[in-house]
Amino acid sequence: MEANHQRNDLGLVALTMLAQYHNISLNPEEIKHKFDLDGKGLSLTSWLLAAKSLALKAKHIKKEISRLHLVNLPALVWQDNGKHFLLVKVDTDNNRYLTYNLEQDAPQILSQDEFEACYQGQLILVTSRASVVGQLAKFDFTWFIPAVIKYRKIFLETLIVSIFLQIFALITPLFFQVVMDKVLVHRGFSTLNIITVALAIVIIFEIVLSGLRTYVFSHSTSRIDVELGAKLFRHLLSLPISYFENRRVGDTVARVRELDQIRNFLTGQALTSVLDLLFSFIFFAVMWYYSPKLTLVILGSLPCYILWSIFISPILRRRLDEKFARSADNQAFLVESVTAINMIKAMAVAPQMTDTWDKQLASYVSSSFRVTVLATIGQQGVQLIQKTVMVINLWLGAHLVISGDLSIGQLIAFNMLSGQVIAPVIRLAQLWQDFQQVGISVTRLGDVLNSPTEQYQGKLSLPEIKGDISFKNIRFRYKPDAPTILNNVNLEIRQGEVIGIVGRSGSGKSTLTKLLQRFYIPENGQVLIDGHDLALADPNWLRRQIGVVLQDNVLLNRSIRENIALSDPGMPMERVIYAAKLAGAHDFISELREGYNTIVGEQGAGLSGGQRQRIAIARALVNNPKILIFDEATSALDYESEHIIMQNMQKICQGRTVILIAHRLSTVKNADRIIVMEKGEIVEQGKHHELLQNSNGLYSYLHQLQLN
């Protein structure tokens, strides 16, 4: 009745779903009590106030259909008749609109005509304050500005060194002019000796300062690189589990590897070339003093470089995008193949996998070749402009010398100065491909760094867990357009109770425990531990006090002791051994040559499946968690290993709340209570013998199947 009543107020339903989308928990009845004073549903004003009370930024706007693709989605389409719905995505290519029908509780795809018929031009845009902060801190090229400010002293020193280098670069052509126009004409050997010594000193200082500048600059950029690498890894581990479930491992790895491109760019010559280019204005002034005509030729060539770059850059960027996509596909396929090597060999499908790899590799090499060809065309275009300018300057300069407007020394000095101006431009043009690649890398890396993390700040860190668990009116789906996984689930688990959860595959058993670990927030309802809403709790505080053992557990490439004591490397050995004994792992560990110092190999490859599982159980027990979850934890064990664990189960469960998820009913038959789930709902609950008395029940049916 309560759900139907809430469904009648589509504004409240929309607010609940949008809050859940932004990882904010709410109690619909509390919102209704505070803001729906007349009982007729939330008005536009009360809806905006309710959103504000939840720390959501909501804005009512009027928008034409042709401009809907520009707004941040999902958004609420407000209807004066109360038939509100959510706009999730706009497909401009096919003129289709992905919406969510709040009344029917289902996603819908509307055509242009269908959408126009129900759209009244009113939208409510919703963002969370956390997402606004995330947008302000968006990772792009502006991310490096605070880093430059942080190391401004070092960059100032680099700037000062660059000034001296430019002064030396300015003096050298003047020496050559004096030699040509004065020394050679007047045969002044003493003057020549002085100039030669002075030039040698200038060259030595120039080499030393140039090396010093490169060292200081590389040192600074390396520190920025370390900061970026550390920030990236911390951010990656802080992302919600849904981020990883929706992306291929290889794609994520490929994006992280883009850090290498940024590193090479920062520590290369590109930024020092920019500094050199800034000082070109001084050289232009000196060159203008020598010959305005020749200077105009040099100035006239600069737009040619710029126009050529503008022409080539968009094409190059598109091809770099394609190259990255092919590289990411290869990375993902390689990771998938290595991970599934046992299956590939067992099914003898290596030829098919090799054929797929060859095709993907050929596609990558082809896209890489197109990038190389285009980059070569770009560089040769720059060389063509440079050579053309050199020929024009030679012809015009010779005419000026012949007419007496310019001396030979001045012409040589001018050409040397023009080289100092053009060289940074040439280097930047040749490094343009690197800059484009870095732009792609920043965008790809930004997909990781700009993804919202799990929110820890402002969450409650509560006292030690006792173990009371409550699921109230839980409704959950993994995506807005996905089917409902849990529907109106209500479950109370008392402190110290051992609960078994059984049911067919896909009935929602594991999803229930994911909500308990706060990997997700329910679309509707609350998950409480000791009366505290987990939506308001610090996830780290919660997960440190819950032990979890899955069917397929991952061990790190470390020693057995380090794997068991993963959460506390300084843990006393006695605690490690005690947990291993509880898990039935101590005996086989003691038989190993290195004992607890045995390296298990990547993902525990050096151990059998049963041994890996027992170490994982010991890892879950070592922190003495008040809540323990076994999610098909014993299904992969041999009967002897399972027997050892089941013998210790009473001691394992002592003083804890335990949730056992199993397909084998023998695993849960001694539980205090057994919960039977079907299609996201609890259909039966009771003790083993009580459930068997209902011959028409699902539990009795599953039990009979296993007996047969």
From Swiss-Prot:
It holds the Pfam family Peptidase_C39. InterPro entries: AAA+_ATPase (IPR003593), ABC1_TM_dom (IPR011527), ABC1_TM_sf (IPR036640), ABC_transporter-like_ATP-bd (IPR003439), ABC_transporter-like_CS (IPR017871), ATPase_T1SS_HlyB (IPR010132), P-loop_NTPase (IPR027417), Peptidase_C39 (IPR005074). It catalyses: ATP + H2O + proteinSide 1 = ADP + phosphate + proteinSide 2. Residues 155-437 form the ABC transmembrane type-1 domain. Residues 469-704 form the ABC transporter domain. One of its GO terms (biological process) is protein secretion by the type I secretion system. The lineage of its organism: Bacteria, Pseudomonadati, Pseudomonadota, Gammaproteobacteria, Pasteurellales. One of its GO terms (cellular component) is type I protein secretion system complex. Belongs to the ABC transporter superfamily. Protein-1 exporter (TC 3.A.1.109) family. Disulfide bonds: none annotated. In LktB the peptidase C39 domain, the ATP-binding domain (NBD) and the transmembrane domain (TMD) are fused. It is a multi-pass membrane protein. Residues 1-126 form the Peptidase C39 domain. This is Leukotoxin translocation ATP-binding protein LktB. SMART domains: AAA. Homodimer. It is found in: Cell inner membrane. Gene3D superfamilies: ABC transporter type 1, transmembrane domain, Cysteine proteinases, P-loop containing nucleotide triphosphate hydrolases.
